[in-house]
Amino acid sequence: RDRGRKRKAPPVKERAVELGIPVLQPEKIGKNREFLDTIRGADADVIVVAAYGRILPKEVLEMPALGCINIHGSLLPRFRGAAPIQAAIIEGDEETGITIMKMAEGLDTGDMLAKASTPIDGKTGQQLHDELSVMGAELLMRTLPELASLEGEKQDDRLSTYAPMISKKDGHIDFSQTAARIERTMRAFDPWPGTYAYCSDKMLKLRKAETLDKASDKEPGTVIEAEGDHIDISCGEGILRVTEIQAPGRKRAAVKEYLKGNSIEIGTVLG
């Protein structure tokens, strides 16, 4: 949906329509005989899946001669699941990447065909998503011509981790965590779902921050400084220095601008 909450076609569909490629958008696949018969009738050599988020039924996996392959946004077997990009940032990994894999009946458990990596540095979820999208397309184009002869590498299930689907409520900040983890979560959830805390009964979205390697004896969530261009908040470990904020119904703004028209009392506990 766009910002007016109206349904908007995904870019892939828009481009497919421009090229005259048939587009099918079933809500469910498993028992949709019309859809399944259409896919079977295409007599495809390979099915490519990207950002689908659901497990394909065995019937579909067995249709193409060369199988179904998935472009997954992590270095498998780490971060199987729906939100691998955000998980890699939150967990503090130094790098992440793309894995081209043969699809199996399990969730992201198939043999790995190709990988490409990139450093995470201080990237946001959106920045990393955009970078991995390009990497994934390039890696796919290098992999497809060799697909018939490629021998996949089995995943070591002992090294697997899971990245569950994200919801809006996951953006509610838990200040008992370390400042470093909270800052990583803020980057991972930028722009969606965003991270937020409550000041009395008002929700504030905390958009950008850095960490201070200082100790505080205040309760986690306590505002210990709010002046100039920052708001400092005590955490389970360290201090979170917020530099960009968003009030309800307003655009995101630098804390310096926010504090010109708003005040936050020292000692206020954000929840």
What are these regions (language model features)?
Residues R1-P191, D201, G238-R241, A247, ...:
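One-carbon transfer enzymes
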Residues E183-G271:
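C-terminal active-site/capping subdomain that shapes the small-molecule cofactor and substrate pocket
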